[in-house]
Amino acid sequence: MSLPSLANLPATLLPAAERAGTALRSAVAALDAAALARLEAWPEERLEDFRRVAAASDFVAEQAVRDSAMLLELAERGELENPHAPGELRSQLQARLEDCADEDELGRRLRRFRTRQQLRIIWRDLTRRAALAETCRDLSALADACIDLACEWLHRRQCEQFGTPIGRRSGEPQRMVVLGMGKLGAVELNLSSDIDLIFGYPEGGETEGAKRSLDNQEFFTRLGQKLIKALDAITVDGFVFRVDMRLRPYGSSGPLVYSFAALEQYYQDQGRDWERYAMIKARVVGGDQQAGEQLLGMLRPFVYRRYLDFSAIEALRTMKQLIQQEVRRKGMSENIKLGEGGIREVEFIAQAFQLIHGGRDLSLQQRPLLKVLATLEGQGYLPPAVVEELRGGYEFLRYAEHAIQALADRQTQMLPSDEYDRIRVAFIMGFASWAAFHERLSHWRARIDWHFRQVIADPDEDESGEAACGSVGAEWIPLWEEALDEESASRQLADAGFVDAEAAWKRLSDLRHGPQVRAMQRLGRERLDAFVPRLLAMTVENPQPDLVLERVLPLVEAVARRSAYLVLLTENPGALERLLTLCAASPMVAEQIARFPILLDELLNEGRLFRPPQAAELAAELRERLMRIPEDDLEQQMETLRHFKLAHGLRVAASEIAGTLPLMKVSDYLTWLAEAILVEVLELAWRQLVQRHGRPLRADGTPCDPDFVIVGYGKVGGLEFGHGSDLDLVFIHDGDPQCETDGGKSIDGAQFFTRLGQKIIHFLTAQTPSGTLYEVDMRLRPSGAAGLLVSSLGAFQRYQEQEAWTWEHQALVRARVLAGCRRVQASFEAVRAEVLARPRDLDALRTEVSEMRAKMRDNLGTRATAAGTASNAFEATAAFDLKHDAGGIVDIEFMVQYAVLAWSGEHPALLEFTDNIRILEGLERAGLIASEDVRLLQEAYKAYRAAAHRLALQKEAGVVSGEHFQTERREVIRIWRELRLG
């Protein structure tokens, strides 16, 4: 955001500006005549800047007089008008400390350097030469440099006295690690921040190399004490930074310094919610950077839970309530950091999402608040309009905070009550009056507070933040807590709409007394007791409460020991409502969520849930997720792939249930999902094998890249994938099977590609905590189960031309490349076209297709109706197998396959697509099947598949009663006969 332009100095501030100018001139004149000449050579713009800044900031006015030589030097070096390059602050301080002789001198030089930089930073901030980001960055870089260089200097001096601390386990020299917390950690320091620090060291041991040794704990405690003194002590030169150590374990009562093991143990066993919040922004600001990153890695699981963690909202809400109580107690409503709509509320909003989702969405594991807000927008957690308001309000508040602190270099966020200071703050912010400034400030605070309440507020509070008179589900509390006898409980359930009230009561009682609930800790039990009444209240709003309760309670039992999921649903009534709707519509969805509760996350965002992404977006999203995971972390890669598949599968099912996705699009999305996963699985498997064995070679000796394709047959090849469909795959390579790979542990090409195929199958079928990706069927490869797992392109072509049965050519109609090398894909498509289009004896072809179809009906069709051919097949008491009986799905597929094999030689356009609907369109365009018959076949095919999809969502077989689809079946049988297929 941008502030209003700086106006002319208000009349009230003109005397202060004149006094400051006169005092500066006198101070410079007292130096020498040359100094005065240098001042008089200042351009008018700089003199005007000085008058403005000095009138607005007592600190600048006083320091300019106290050390006018410093101000002249800053001006002549261009530091007032130009930004510092990265690393420049550190370089300047390093040069100033080079010949530092003792600790007193260290303190003096640090303080003078801080004063110099503080003056420069305030000058640039108040003259608008520096944007907010630069000001915060420079202040944080100043703190980093002072902390790290002072720590380095003191460590060196202490080693001379007591020897070098050595790790007992590693035998390596040890250095202290300084973690910067809060605004320092996030590179967001304000003009007069204190700095929150935590000290650690890698491991216990003792010093070596001096007459008197210390154990490492004592060595680093002394070092920490000296560092605090060097930075925090107030002397005639002022201070460097106020140091706050209260964020360390046990606060002020705990040791000053901790070993890494002690820190990890503390946070694992005793870490509190507010400490997770504080640790989000932790950054290594001094000491051993490499060891510090190791420490942060050890603590990351404490901060970011791998499951959805809505308990974070409870913690943030509690913290906010405590802050509000303190604000009210101390009359701090005018505090722009802690008051309503203040800076802290924006931070809480961002950190709520980080703590809830950051364990799974690694893009949220970052420190700067504005970057987090951008990620929340980019990843769809918050709408752009909300992020724009939060960003604008936050920046306005931070500018105002700097304006207040610039007055006297004092740590405060309270709006001034003094009229003179109010005029100064309004002037700095670019407003003509305090009233105009305060009106804009109030606007931003109101917007921030409104958004804060949407994210953090208790769902049982009203808009004022007070507890609502009757929280949702309060009428069900006595029943759940068994304050009612069984008869009264059943009556309440029946009155609320349950058909079988006794069964509903038994289910609730079984849950309450079941082993999962009995084993819950107190906090989890409290969460369950808060959730179940809310669940019952929303269940009775559904037209099928018995069914909903039956399907949802297994989920409640499944997550009982991970009660954060109960908090998620309690905190998000919309998500709970969507859960009940989906469970009522589909037992498959209910069981999937109960088995993988992490899917509850998908229910939070209604827009995302019912709008699955397009193919390119799917692939890009998966690629981005995997790129955030270290290449050697196979376990996390496998889990990410599985969660991605589960999440998007749920989104497709939800869209199907809601009616926002038609059948053809459902299959498209599920097919695209499989394709995106196969592309990444191939990449993972290829990378692993190449790292171990090197790359396989082509016949000309050049390396393969990867010269391998995954071919999809059946439903995935025909873009007709369904929920729970298997992958029918064939692997083909075009490398040299005899040539050895070019790596250290070389193997021949045939071995390499076989192992590549095995690894792909393993990645797809391996059982992990998030289940498997897909079941894989490789029986359509050349020679079936007896054939090689991976065929060379040449071998595949020879097999198709010389050995393949007609039914294998039928299968080839639906075959297409899903992932792999474009060159080999083009070669495969050429082989496919050549094989399918070759001339055939049509009588022999009809016989072979008919015989194969008859064999399938005999084995897979409904026996009681002779696979739909008997006279009773159309009776209501009969069963019709949508796929295998006469007039069903397979009949249509066989007709399409017959047509391609019979006529694609003369009509090559029939080979363009692999899905039945578009091949039928091609047959119509070629005049091979009448338009009316094509419409009949297409509509019947879509109707059958839609019914099969609906049954799959109900976990039922693809069978309906014989009275269904009678017209469609008869027409399909008629067309089958007209094609003389038996």
Curated annotation (Swiss-Prot):
The keyword Magnesium applies. It is an enzyme of class 2 (transferase). GO terms for molecular function: [glutamate-ammonia-ligase] adenylyltransferase activity; [glutamine synthetase]-adenylyl-L-tyrosine phosphorylase activity; ATP binding; magnesium ion binding. It comes from the Bacteria. Keywords: ATP-binding, Magnesium, Multifunctional enzyme, Nucleotide-binding, Nucleotidyltransferase, Transferase. It catalyses: [glutamine synthetase]-O(4)-(5'-adenylyl)-L-tyrosine + phosphate = [glutamine synthetase]-L-tyrosine + ADP; [glutamine synthetase]-L-tyrosine + ATP = [glutamine synthetase]-O(4)-(5'-adenylyl)-L-tyrosine + diphosphate. Residues 473-982 are annotated as: Adenylyl transferase. Its cofactor is Mg(2+). Pfam families: GlnD_UR_UTase (PF08335), GlnE (PF03710). Residues 1-460 are annotated as: Adenylyl removase. The keyword Nucleotidyltransferase applies. Its EC number is 2.7.7.89, 2.7.7.42. InterPro entries: GlnE (IPR023057), GlnE_rpt_dom (IPR005190), NT_sf (IPR043519), PII_UdlTrfase/GS_AdlTrfase (IPR013546). GO terms for biological process: regulation of glutamine family amino acid metabolic process. One of its GO terms (cellular component) is cytosol. HAMAP family: GlnE. NCBIfam families: PRK11072.1. Involved in the regulation of glutamine synthetase GlnA, a key enzyme in the process to assimilate ammonia. When cellular nitrogen levels are high, the C-terminal adenylyl transferase (AT) inactivates GlnA by covalent transfer of an adenylyl group from ATP to specific tyrosine residue of GlnA, thus reducing its activity. Conversely, when nitrogen levels are low, the N-terminal adenylyl removase (AR) activates GlnA by removing the adenylyl group by phosphorolysis, increasing its activity. Belongs to the GlnE family. PANTHER family: BIFUNCTIONAL GLUTAMINE SYNTHETASE ADENYLYLTRANSFERASE_ADENYLYL-REMOVING ENZYME (PTHR30621:SF0), GLUTAMINE SYNTHETASE ADENYLYLTRANSFERASE (PTHR30621). This is Bifunctional glutamine synthetase adenylyltransferase/adenylyl-removing enzyme. It comes from Pseudomonas aeruginosa (strain ATCC 15692 / DSM 22644 / CIP 104116 / JCM 14847 / LMG 12228 / 1C / PRS 101 / PAO1). The gene is glnE.
